[in-house]
């Protein structure tokens, strides 16, 4: 057991760690269909392999759609091979990764135990495909499809009800995030009210504006009922890279050779895009209690965005905006925007004062391949080791606790049992001291300038 440590004249309890970025889904198609209204079950099941709605960066394949774990691992192994990783070794690693360390759902309690083993006490749970065979049409149907609208709400409704059960299996430890379709605003508002009553408290996942036609930008008054419902029920508006942002013309512009890199590069911009529509559209003036979390999008971009918006606000055509906004763009960011820093790098942690210690949240991206399992505790030491204790308390847990409404006392009990302690993060570890696992290799920091470029 990990008890509280004694410091100079005071007790120093372990850190509370909330992963602001996690993903969960039903284990297979049959489990998912059990949650679909029988009147729509056949239509949802017949929607096919979802290849028409898969993000192009996956080459038209949704690795989370298959109910065959071997097929899922084969897709992931091919992706690793494209990054120069030995395919056979990748298959061996993925077989172990998806049976020992990561779990799509938690039918047998293994997921909760795996997270505690990694020093994680609670999670903000987004939908998404996961490597252990999980199925999550909700990730795509909420905003990525241009066809099959008749199955969108039955599929989303099914996922959301599964999510309520998933969260209820670990009370107070999982803040589920609600995917929505915004073409039917009345139904979206009803779903928010239902979700809050069902114990889903992680907020909503906002689709990017660009992925489906027929809807205005997020500055438009069309979304007023949505913002009002989020305020009323205390639901955070979440923008998650990949799950809530990609390009409408991706299929036309991306090809097999270039699509993977282009998709990964551009998806970050499309995920942030709703934020400046909301700021410049006066959404936060009309809804002062609204909070937006941008997750798995890095953290270094936010100070630059604020500087750019402030500059334009004062100069290039900013007069019309100044005439109706009550505050400056930077003020809205300071009051309403937080960042889910999935697998932050050390240099990002060292930017914490520039970005804002009170708006940074650590995310482990469990159970995705680019997450830190099973070396999460070492990664924490590398990223945060030796930094001020009070800053780490906020970034690792307190900011997420306050934003989403976790019970701090409950999580402190878990932290006392499993750590990490203050001593654990008092000193860091070098990058080379972290085992070179296939999963961690995808998230390891790289030089900002390549060796080839620096040699020229």
Where are these regions (language model features)?
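Active-site-proximal gating segment of KS-fold condensing enzymes and close homologs
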Residues: 146-166
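Mid-to-C-terminal alpha-helical segments outside catalytic/metal-binding sites
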Residues: 2-16, 30-86, 90-117, 121-122, ...
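Short aromatic-enriched loop/helix-cap "lid" or pocket-rim segments at secondary-structure transitions
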Residues: 29-32, 135-138, 249-252, 304-308, ...
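Short glycine/proline- and charge-enriched loop/turn segments
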Residues: 139-147, 254-264, 376-381
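Catalytic pocket-lining loop regions of alpha/beta-barrel enzymes
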Residues: 151-152, 167-175, 180, 186, ...
């Amino acid at each position: 057991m990990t008890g509280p440590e004694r410091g100079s004249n005071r007790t120093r309890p372990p850190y509370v760690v909330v992963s602001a970025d996690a993903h969960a889904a039903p284990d297979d198609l049959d489990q998912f269909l059990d949650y679909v209204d029988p009147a729509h079950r056949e239509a949802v099941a017949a929607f096919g392999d979802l290849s028409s709605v898969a993000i192009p960066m996956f080459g038209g394949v949704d690795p989370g759609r298959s109910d065959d774990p071997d097929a899922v691992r084969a897709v992931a192994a091919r992706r690793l091979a494209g990054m120069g990783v030995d395919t056979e070794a990748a298959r061996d690693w993925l077989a172990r990764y998806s049976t020992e360390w990561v779990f799509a759902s938690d039918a047998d309690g293994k997921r909760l135990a795996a997270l505690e083993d990694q020093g994680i006490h609670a999670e903000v749970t987004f939908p998404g495909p996961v490597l252990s065979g999980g199925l999550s049409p909700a990730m795509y149907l909420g905003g990525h499809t241009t066809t099959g609208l008749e199955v969108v709400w039955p599929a989303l409704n099914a996922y959301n009800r599964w999510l309520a059960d998933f969260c209820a299996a670990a009370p107070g430890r999982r803040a589920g995030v609600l995917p929505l379709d915004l073409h039917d605003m009345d139904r979206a508002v009803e779903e928010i009210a239902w979700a809050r009553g069902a114990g889903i408290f992680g907020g909503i996942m906002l689709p990017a504006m660009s992925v489906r036609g027929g809807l205005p930008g997020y500055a438009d008054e069309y979304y007023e009922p949505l913002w009002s419902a989020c305020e009323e029920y205390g639901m955070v508006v979440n923008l998650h890279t990949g799950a809530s942002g990609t390009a409408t013309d991706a299929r036309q512009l991306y090809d097999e050779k270039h699509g993977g890199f282009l998709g990964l590069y551009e998806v970050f911009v499309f995920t942030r895009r709703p934020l400046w529509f909301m700021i410049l559209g006066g959404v936060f003036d009309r809804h002062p209690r609204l909070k937006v979390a941008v997750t798995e999008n890095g953290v270094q971009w936010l100070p630059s965005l604020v500087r750019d918006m402030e500059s334009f606000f004062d100069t290039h055509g900013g007069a019309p905006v100044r005439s109706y906004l009550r505050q400056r763009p930077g003020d809205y960011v300071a009051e309403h925007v937080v960042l889910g820093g999935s697998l932050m790098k050390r240099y990002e942690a060292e930017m914490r004062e520039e970005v804002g210690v009170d708006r940074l949240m650590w995310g482990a991206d469990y159970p995705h391949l680019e997450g830190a399992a099973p070396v999460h505790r070492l990664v924490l030491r590398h990223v945060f080791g030796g930094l001020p204790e009070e800053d780490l308390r906020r970034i690792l847990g307190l900011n997420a606790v306050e934003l989403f409404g976790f019970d701090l006392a409950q999580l402190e009990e878990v932290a006392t049992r499993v750590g990490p302690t203050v001593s654990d993060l008092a000193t860091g570890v070098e990058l080379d001291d972290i085992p070179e696992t296939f999963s961690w290799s995808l998230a390891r920091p790289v030089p900002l300038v390549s060796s080839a470029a620096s040699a020229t």
